[in-house]
């Protein structure tokens, strides 16, 4: 029986999350979510269950409202890196969820790395 796209996505998400939990060592998690029209990123402290910084194309100040392209993803990556630096965060691990690491997700990760985040 062939797996649907959604089933494959859920399998990837569980596999990625389990690997990250095994190597977390108390670091923060940079979680990324991509929809058909927007992309968002959050720095999450799983130990306390708190979001420390967030950025999204839904923010009007970013100027990419309703856009989900590589340029908008890079802008979100730069923004989350700036907000992480302002909060005193330098290291985290990248949680791509079930999304493949290319295109928009890769652009966000590269921009966050250029902004000073280490993962």
From Swiss-Prot:
Signal peptide per UniProt: none
GO molecular function, one term: 5S rRNA binding
Entry-linked InterPro entries: Ribosomal_uL18_bac-type, Ribosomal_uL18_bac/euk
Organism domain of life: Bacteria
One GO biological process term: translation
Listed GO CC annotations: cytosolic large ribosomal subunit
Record keywords: Ribonucleoprotein, Ribosomal protein, RNA-binding, rRNA-binding
Pfam families: Ribosomal_L18p
Keyword RNA-binding (UniProt): yes
Annotated coiled-coil segments of the chain: none
UniProt subunit comment: Part of the 50S ribosomal subunit; part of the 5S rRNA/L5/L18/L25 subcomplex. Contacts the 5S and 23S rRNAs.
UniProt similarity note: Belongs to the universal ribosomal protein uL18 family.
Functional description taken from the UniProt entry: This is one of the proteins that bind and probably mediate the attachment of the 5S RNA into the large ribosomal subunit, where it forms part of the central protuberance.
Protein name per its UniProtKB record: Large ribosomal subunit protein uL18
Species the sequence originates in: Cereibacter sphaeroides (strain ATCC 17025 / ATH 2.4.3)
């Amino acid at each position: 029986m062939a797996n649907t796209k959604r089933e494959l996505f859920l399998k990837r998400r569980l596999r990625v999350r389990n690997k990250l939990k095994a190597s977390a060592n108390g670091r923060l998690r940079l979680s990324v979510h991509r929809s058909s029209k927007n992309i968002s990123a959050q720095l999450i402290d799983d130990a306390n269950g708190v979001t420390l910084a967030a950025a999204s194309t839904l923010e009007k100040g970013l100027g990419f409202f309703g856009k989900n392209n590589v340029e908008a993803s890079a802008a979100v990556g730069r923004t989350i890196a700036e907000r992480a630096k302002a909060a005193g965060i330098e290291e985290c691990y990248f949680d791509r969820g079930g999304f493949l690491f290319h295109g928009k997700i890769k652009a966000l990760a590269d921009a966050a790395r250029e902004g000073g985040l280490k993962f």
